């Protein structure tokens, strides 16, 4: 780890532990609240998927009223009968117009020539340089490797439908509406190639980071793939349609409904446990910081009120040379003045008046010999 990184780490540590750890406690509390909100949303999604009926493609029309099936709905009109359903089937291109258009309603991968309904291509630059030789063991290097470098990302899609797996004809289907879908797609990687980029010696010498390759990845959704769709089912101009629900983490997936429920239950338990741990730790740290702040405030208030009290003068009225005082009568704290007052209630005479006054000003005054809590002191006179 380099010196600037070490200095930055020390600065962040000092900030987190400042105010008796209150900053760290507040940070953990905010993280706990975020985890609790994440748990609530994940648990709500789990409940929706559990309650969603899993039906076959041919039985979908029975879920909505017949009037909705026959009516021509406007794009701006939202049906009150929309509901979340789970269907499983095979994806096929949507046939529009004559039958001869079927073969042209698919995409062709430019690299492999495979037919596809969705093509997603990602191009990412791979960097190298002499700077990475000195950061190969640091946390900064690990963070940089996890970040995405500049590149290109584009997706092409064609209209497609889901039909029953054992269905002989395409009379029963549900159209897939991809508008507004942000969930991950069940794509298959068909092309993965690292294309080297020639760099000059001057570029490698002057620039700490320079591109050495272009990683080109192509993923497709091939026709005939078995998938599960979970989303909002409705009719669009009399055509059954399913679109994504923004509250759910899945839309098109290779997992079955039972696998989705199992996966969400694991996520829910993990998020719940994490939020509980973060909450307990944050409450403990904030409680510790609050107690420390309260004690400091009491001590400050106690010291502020001391000058207002009618105290005896702490100036020695019996100045003596320390060499003339026997060892058994010297103050155990300063070892330069005679022991005068006795602490109450233990009765020990071990301090001079000045040191005894200092001990009494403490937040929790104790006798320096027996460590018993004291209420004050009184002068002892010897006859």
Curated annotation (Swiss-Prot):
GO molecular function: ubiquitin-protein transferase activity; zinc ion binding
Enzyme class, UniProt record, top EC level: transferase
Keyword Transit peptide: no
Recorded GO CC terms: chloroplast; chloroplast envelope; chloroplast outer membrane
Disulfide bond entries: none
GO biological process, one term: protein ubiquitination
Segments forming RING-type zinc fingers: 331-370
Main function: Possesses E3 ubiquitin-protein ligase activity.
Protein name per its UniProtKB record: E3 ubiquitin-protein ligase SPL2
Organism: Arabidopsis thaliana
The encoding gene: SPL2
